[in-house]
């Protein structure tokens, strides 16, 4: 086919099977094989989330619910989705990610076989549009972050049409809780979660770039076939949420929609914004 780049998963559970003990043999092998075949690599960090779920987190992480809490449904049921509101989750995920970036820098900063990193994989909430854990509820009922209100004001005439219409239909307020600013529905839940997922990713990228400055991107599971948030992985970097992601995670270099449906041109056109 003449392709010259391969996308290779970097599995957290295989890299750190025991807490604090790292094994990069599969990373080394992938880079070795790529060089032999004159290929470049984009590593996909399967860390806290892969296709919404935390299926590639290590067992020591999965088994410690108290230290590494999961998101919860509205009825309080825990999901196998690590909470983006937990500092312990972030610290464990980012520590392993930084170790990966350090290792790549040590073995590849001259040859540059690795050209880009995907941070997490198809982030998003399932079953519900947002997390209903105690910390999530506290933040949901708090005022919008100043950074977001400033962005809304500054970019009012250039927002994605969906976000602008939703905001204006709720009254166009600048100050208030998430529901006071965006209205009381499932899509406000999604906006809220998008902010905190994007904020988490921004911190991950900043941590990784401190040790090795590679381009980094995030991919998105699409909201096709008329599904509602939670029926698809809600709050990922979808077109209608692009302003939220741009504001909370300005360090992301690319947003990459995962397209399994027809209509590539139509899907990608939805991402077109002034910035």
Cite the ranges covered by each PLM segment.
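Aromatic-lined substrate-binding rim segments of carbohydrate-active enzymes
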Residues: 1-70, 194-211
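Structural preference for beta-strand elements that scaffold enzyme active sites
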Residues: 5-7, 38-42, 112-118, 213-217, ...
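Active-site-proximal loop/turn and secondary-structure-junction residues that shape catalytic pockets
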Residues: 12, 47-49, 121-123, 222-224, ...
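Extracytoplasmic/secreted cell-surface and envelope-processing proteins
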Residues: 15-18, 51-53, 126, 226, ...
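Alpha-helical scaffolding within the catalytic cores
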Residues: 26-29, 100, 233-245, 262-267
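Catalytic-core region of carbohydrate-active enzymes that cleave or remodel glycosidic bonds
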Residues: 39, 203-214, 241-275
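Aromatic- and carboxylate-enriched substrate-binding clefts and catalytic-loop regions
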Residues: 46, 129-133, 137, 265, ...
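Polysaccharide-binding and catalytic clefts of secreted carbohydrate-active enzymes
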Residues: 68-242
